[in-house]
Amino acid sequence: LTNEPTSLTDAYAFIKMRQRDGGDGPINVVVNMVAAAREGQTAFRALQKACESFLKLSPSLLGIVRRDAKVRESIRNQMSILSRYPNALAALDVEVIATKLAPRAACNFTASAAGA
């Protein structure tokens, strides 16, 4: 999701199709390419409000990745932002999101390994 209206429409349509097709599990949203966290929260709240009103579900905000010129430079150099510019704003934001996901991945891996 970005703060662009078309992105909001696309995210909502994706969530609606997922629900229609019987998708289960939580819906976690990452807001990307925003100038500041507040802008990302505003974009997320618009999506959340639409989902709650029309789909009767509430997605969760997994994280916000701020707009950062270092991302474009990383792409040009064909390297991840985490490798090329680990202290860039976007890299720090991605690390926060990864930290939130890591316990879930470990839990899913453990359950899978146990044959659950």
Report each predicted region and the residues it spans.
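Conserved Switch II/interswitch segment of TRAFAC-class P-loop GTPases
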Residues: 1-13, 36-40
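Alpha-helical scaffold segments in soluble metabolic enzymes
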Residues: 13, 17, 70, 93-100
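Signal for well-folded cores of large energy- and translation-related assemblies
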Residues: 16-19, 35, 52, 66, ...
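Arginine/glycine-rich "motif VI" loop of SF2 helicases in the C-terminal RecA-like domain
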Residues: 17-25, 50-58
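Structural beta-sheet core signal
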Residues: 28-31
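Beta-strand-loop-alpha "switch" segments that mediate conformational coupling across diverse proteins
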Residues: 54-80, 94
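NTP-binding/hydrolysis catalytic cores, primarily Walker-type P-loop NTPases
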Residues: 76-116
